[in-house]
Amino acid sequence: MEELSMANTMFALNLLKQIEKSNSTQNIFISPWSISSTLAIVLLGAGGNTEQQMAKVLQFNEIGSYGITTRNPENFSGCDFAQQIQKENYPSAILQAQAGDKIHSAFSSLSSTINTPQGDYLLESANKLFGEKSARFKEEYIQLSKKYYSTEPEAVDFLECAEEAREKINSWVKTQTKGEIPNLLPEGSVDEDTKMVLVNAVYFKGKWKTPFEKKLNGLYPFRVNSHESIPVQMMFLHAKLNIGYIKDLKTQILELPHTGNISMLLLLPDEIEDASTGLELLESEINFANFNKWISKDTLDEDDVVVYIPKFKLAQSYELKSILQSMGMEDAFNKGKANFSGMSERNDLFLSEVFHQASVDVTEEGTVAAGGTGAVMTGRTGHGGPQFVADHPFLFFIMDKITHTILFVGRFSSP
């Protein structure tokens, strides 16, 4: 599970960089863990170059002996396995099965740990593969999806009733997220040519370990760039927290713990020193090695900290096809090249789109709460210790500290 968390972190940071390229100044909020686990459901039925590309994008090739395929012994029919032996691939077939079982078993354990709250927080997710009813998913694939991911692909009629299929998918997502995400698929997002769509929606609400002080909250100018400000409701907290400083990037890093195993890590440059959000240098330097160094005990120390951060809610939707293609996952979306032979006997299956939405509330208590209406703030306190004043764009990560998994990553650049 530790190796999988490492792969998920690398995927999360790579995904963030790709999204940043097409969203240089906008708010960002995604759940890379949720996207990765959903794509793994598709990987379970992929083969050949399609599978290799997916494994590489998801960083599974960095884990142990992950090879050409992730198929488990259950995936090989008697004929398939016999053919492997006849081709003198018996040892590699065994290794491939073991590698695949390692990945998918680890996902099963990781999901179970994350979805079993150790504190007062809510994590609602909806992950499912929807395929054209003519696909006729293999029973072996259905059973493995249930075994590892507690879900199974669902057949819908894209060919004759695309709009009804869209409404059915949206209704399912709305139910799974308890009404928080009602319209994941926009109008026109599926049609009669759609073969398979992957949906992934996740909603997080948590309680701060130390709640913010409502009575001291108020309006404060948030600088979206070097020449523009927007009034925003600021939250105030004075508490002992882990805080650090990345000298070469002139960036503060602060840990705000939720109840349980969840923490939010915020990265805030000292000033806006570029022509956009002030985050360009920080975003360019994010990678696996740097991130681990920034959040380590070598960087973070407990101190008496005064904190101002905006109260905000983000609900961001993405169609990830082009982003995943740019990361190297090309064949899965190509009608002529996609290989999903582990899913179906049909050779014309391909992914049409991957829909993702993530939503979060950041309030005084952490969960949805009434806003305070204090006096307008015009300056900072006289506190002699470190201050963390997020009055300009910052990055934030919501992490499960037990599994070291990045559940969410976001950029807050504008109220």
From Swiss-Prot:
Known glycosylation sites: N23, N75, N261, N339
GO biological process: negative regulation of apoptotic process
Xref: Pfam families: Serpin
Site feature: Reactive bond: R380, T381
GO molecular function: serine-type endopeptidase inhibitor activity
Keyword terms, alphabetized: Cytoplasm, Glycoprotein, Plasminogen activation, Protease inhibitor, Secreted, Serine protease inhibitor, Signal
Subcellular locations according to the entry: Cytoplasm; Secreted, Extracellular space
PROSITE patterns per the UniProt record, alphabetical: SERPIN
PTM statement from Swiss-Prot or TrEMBL: The signal sequence is not cleaved.
GO cellular component: cornified envelope; cytoplasm; extracellular space
Keyword Transport: no
Family as reported in the entry's similarity comment: Belongs to the serpin family. Ov-serpin subfamily.
Function: Inhibits urokinase-type plasminogen activator. The monocyte derived PAI-2 is distinct from the endothelial cell-derived PAI-1. Not required for normal murine development or survival.
Self-association and partners: Interacts with PSMB1.
Name of protein: Plasminogen activator inhibitor 2, macrophage
Organism in which the protein naturally occurs: Mus musculus
